């Protein structure tokens, strides 16, 4: 959530910043609400002053033995006017709050101009896509031949955009998640957290999914307003909602492996085949909480940590910085890491890493105590995938496939697979 004071005092500057992401700030509404608020505030202050003056006059009239009934009536009238004015002020404040909740974050100055993912800017590549001397298969056909990836059964059990993983592929999927966790914990210094997979509205508001993106969420059908998490970012970041951390506790670096649940309401007809876009998938999530002056540096470190997983798996990938028109609602700056998918002959997103600055912290009232001033200040929060496990699985299957339909297991995963080196096709 943006700073209300900034919106009121630097409206044109904010509007210019938001225009980079293609968002048109309703400047007229801000001005109208502010004028109304000020008018009611002035009216309230005048009524309070008049009430105080009349109250003093009543005291003097009583001492003089005069009739105070007219003065009492006037004071009662003023009290009712004050009640009405305070109610009007509350209504204006509610309208303002709802208005501000729907405004996205301001992109960082260095975020490139652009309207869509076509305008994102590649900043580096790692590895060369493999040249195959045989007709390649996609992960759906490979998984079926390996006897471990079954979309038809998942559709029978639940519906479309779900998968059943079995045998070696299920084990490989688990190995990937474990490898990611171990790397981030042992090499990058993250604290592992086992989090709830169900959260309340306050948590989803804190990280920016609510109220704007409710249709993308799976909601439990009872009166408690619980939701399945769309990402572990939600519970991880909310750990310090309504909290004040000491400066020496920072940075906070959390990692969690969890299922994620998304309705994909706006993705009808997109990526309907395979594991690219699922209603349920697993992800290893990275979350940072830092002092404001350290968040830019933290974002670069977070991205490097996610890239390290792909380096170790020897999967070709590239990193792009998202343009203003493609960054998410809460983000000030985002890098996407895209892995090479041979069957599609292109790079596909496998991680999105964002600096949210104080946008979430203001919604959550997540703060730290500045060691210089001793006063609480808003934290900066960051998040990123380290990585999406299902998409990493499909990248391994496709990039490591062999002509006979087998799949070589990446060397770094073999200790998690009991030393197994190859997934072999199931004989029909």
Swiss-Prot record:
This is Serine--tRNA ligase. One of its GO terms (molecular function) is serine-tRNA ligase activity. Catalyzes the attachment of serine to tRNA(Ser). Is also able to aminoacylate tRNA(Sec) with serine, to form the misacylated tRNA L-seryl-tRNA(Sec), which will be further converted into selenocysteinyl-tRNA(Sec). It catalyses: tRNA(Ser) + L-serine + ATP = L-seryl-tRNA(Ser) + AMP + diphosphate + H(+); tRNA(Sec) + L-serine + ATP = L-seryl-tRNA(Sec) + AMP + diphosphate + H(+). InterPro entries: aa-tRNA-synt_IIb, aa-tRNA-synth_II, aa-tRNA-synth_II/BPL/LPL, Ser-tRNA-ligase_type_1, Ser-tRNA-synth_1_N, SerRS_1_N_sf, SerRS_core, tRNA-bd_arm. CDD domains: SerRS_core (cd00770). Its EC number is 6.1.1.11. ATP binds at residues 262-264, 349-352. It is an enzyme of class 6 (ligase). It comes from Cellvibrio japonicus (strain Ueda107). Homodimer. The tRNA molecule binds across the dimer. The lineage of its organism: Bacteria, Pseudomonadati, Pseudomonadota, Gammaproteobacteria, Cellvibrionales. L-serine binds at residues 231-233, 285, 385. Keywords: Aminoacyl-tRNA synthetase, ATP-binding, Cytoplasm, Ligase, Nucleotide-binding, Protein biosynthesis. PROSITE patterns: AA_TRNA_LIGASE_II. Its main location: cytoplasm. HAMAP family: Ser_tRNA_synth_type1 (MF_00176). Consists of two distinct domains, a catalytic core and a N-terminal extension that is involved in tRNA binding. One of its GO terms (biological process) is seryl-tRNA aminoacylation. Belongs to the class-II aminoacyl-tRNA synthetase family. Type-1 seryl-tRNA synthetase subfamily. It is found in: Cytoplasm. The keyword Membrane does not apply. Signal peptide: none annotated. It comes from the Bacteria. Pathway: Aminoacyl-tRNA biosynthesis; selenocysteinyl-tRNA(Sec) biosynthesis; L-seryl-tRNA(Sec) from L-serine and tRNA(Sec): step 1/1.
